[in-house]
């Protein structure tokens, strides 16, 4: 059924469909009785799926990745869609329109998306007001980025301002320095640039702070960011963002679409590689959230057993439909029971030793 609906929706421009579908989801979950019914039906109800991570209780490990609900206008929607949590944003200290359209493209042969949205959002202040007015049934993290017009040498103050506004209201904060769609942003992943940003955010809030990294980092850069995260006392790392690589894509004409980051299956292999590397290096000290190319319950299970305590998806939701998160959670629960695991935590990293030696 959803396959037919998806084919019809894919006849329309992607960003228009996003706005339409998002509006429908918000409308369908606006009434409290309906929302509660959907949450009971679609949500992760098996106790084995629940876990407490950096002091926050998550009913299920799969969350909505940042980018879908940029301004937190669907805060009451995501539990009813079966997610164990949601990450809203990316928001910036100042409102901004993002990049000119068209800026979102489908790669159907790859079941992927290409976007160059550019952090279009209403600002951290507007999100803070929404967070203060709503009490979602699942944890809500906030992803913060740099305002495009803010010079790199003022990035610390920009991130600090966002953290001050939304930090007290979020379940956790993610410092996004890995989007390819804000000029110069990825340069902030260099340790000498990243250190003062993370230190400023940590000083501004007692909320757990994580950093989101790109799949295109070299292994040595991944190691340096991981070591910095441990040194500063971050809660964890989100790995990974979209990739700028075009290697192996099947959809014709991708080269004519222009710049942007690709999400979905094309990033899956590298995302898993980065996860494995991080777990071997800092998995005993940091929480790892895996995102990038998760489509099936088997994909999700691979990430958990490789070291991810939590998972996120966006593109899989687009291609998988409204039952996607339920199918993922049901599949994880089934594998936990079949494997004799008493909890999700017991399964995290259970297959890591078979994936290679720790990095030198």
Curated annotation (Swiss-Prot):
Binds 1 FMN per subunit. Pathway: Pyrimidine metabolism; UMP biosynthesis via de novo pathway; orotate from (S)-dihydroorotate (quinone route): step 1/1. It is an enzyme of class 1 (oxidoreductase). It is found in: Cell membrane. It holds the Pfam family DHO_dh. Its EC number is 1.3.5.2. Monomer. This is Dihydroorotate dehydrogenase (quinone). The lineage of its organism: Bacteria, Bacillati, Actinomycetota, Actinomycetes, Mycobacteriales. The gene is pyrD.
């Amino acid at each position: 059924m959803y396959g037919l609906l998806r084919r019809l929706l894919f006849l329309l421009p992607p960003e228009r469909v996003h706005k339409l579908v998002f509006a429908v989801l918000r409308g369908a979950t606006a009434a409290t009785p309906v929302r509660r019914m959907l949450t009971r039906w679609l949500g992760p109800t098996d106790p084995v799926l629940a876990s407490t991570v950096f002091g926050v209780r998550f009913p299920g490990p799969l969350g909505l990745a940042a980018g879908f609900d940029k301004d937190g206008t669907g805060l009451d929607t995501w539990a009813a869609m079966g997610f164990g949590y949601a990450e809203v944003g990316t928001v910036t200290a100042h409102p901004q329109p993002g990049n000119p359209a068209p800026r979102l493209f489908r790669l159907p042969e790859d079941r992927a998306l290409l976007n160059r949205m550019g952090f279009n959002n209403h600002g951290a202040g507007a999100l803070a007001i929404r967070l203060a007015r709503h009490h979602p049934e699942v944890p809500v993290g906030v992803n913060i980025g740099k305002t495009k017009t803010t010079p790199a040498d003022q990035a610390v103050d920009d991130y600090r301002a966002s953290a001050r506004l939304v930090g007290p209201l979020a379940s956790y904060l993610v410092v996004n320095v890995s989007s390819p769609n804000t000029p110069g942003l990825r340069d902030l992943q260099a340790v000498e640039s990243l250190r003062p940003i993370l230190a400023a955010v940590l000083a501004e809030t007692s909320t757990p702070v994580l950093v989101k990294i790109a799949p295109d980092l070299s292994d040595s850069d991944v190691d340096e960011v991981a070591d910095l995260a441990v040194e500063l006392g971050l809660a964890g790392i989100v790995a990974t963002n979209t990739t700028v690589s075009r290697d192996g894509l099947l959809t014709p004409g991708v080269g004519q679409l222009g710049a942007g980051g690709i999400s979905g299956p094309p990033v899956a292999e590298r995302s898993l590689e980065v996860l494995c590397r991080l777990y071997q290096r800092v998995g005993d000290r940091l929480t790892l959230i895996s995102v990038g190319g998760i489509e099936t319950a088997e994909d999700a299970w691979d990430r958990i057993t490789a070291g991810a305590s939590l998972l996120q998806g966006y593109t899989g939701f687009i291609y998988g439909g409204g039952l996607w998160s339920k199918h993922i959670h049901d599949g994880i629960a089934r594998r936990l029971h079949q494997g004799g695991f008493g909890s999700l935590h017991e399964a995290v990293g259970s297959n890591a030793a078979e994936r290679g030696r720790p990095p030198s």
